[in-house]
From Swiss-Prot:
Transmembrane parts of this sequence: none
Source lineage: Bacteria, Pseudomonadati, Pseudomonadota, Gammaproteobacteria, Alteromonadales
Gene: cyaY
Cysteine disulfide links: none
Signal peptide: none
NCBIfam families the record matches: FeS_CyaY (TIGR03421)
Protein name stated in the entry: Iron-sulfur cluster assembly protein CyaY
PANTHER family registered for this protein in UniProt: FRATAXIN, FRATAXIN, MITOCHONDRIAL
Coiled-coil positions: none
Gene Ontology cellular component list: cytosol
Length: 109
């Protein structure tokens, strides 16, 4: 079943907030060095080496797009989960792994 624009934004905003909270915890507990910039439909993480992970909402498609230094990924809401259309991976574990791989920061959700 398709989700409405309102549902899409609520689900995406909840995920963005969970990521921000986990990063803030990592900064406090691990002395992680990462900058968070949340602006509109975009959440951008910049690591000490200058690399970035950009997560953005694609409202017309009801997708979340993620760009890492390893590639770009598109996640759609399928059966209650955000899933990658190419490889079937789930969004939050993917983001957790990407942040650890790219920035060396272990997140807990």
């Amino acid at each position: 079943m398709a989700i409405t624009d309102t549902e899409f934004h609520q689900l995406a905003d909840d995920m963005f907030q969970a990521i921000e909270n986990a990063i803030e915890t990592a900064i406090d507990e691990q002395d992680a060095d990462v900058d968070i910039d949340a602006s509109g439909n975009v959440l951008q993480l910049e690591f000490v080496d200058g690399s970035k992970i950009v997560i953005n909402k694609q409202e017309p498609l009801h997708e979340i797009w993620v760009a890492t230094r390893f590639g770009g990924y598109h996640f759609g809401f399928v059966e209650g989960k955000w899933m990658d259309g190419r490889n079937g991976g789930e969004f939050m574990p993917f983001v957790q792994e990407s942040i650890e791989r790219q920035g060396g920061i272990k997140l807990s959700f």
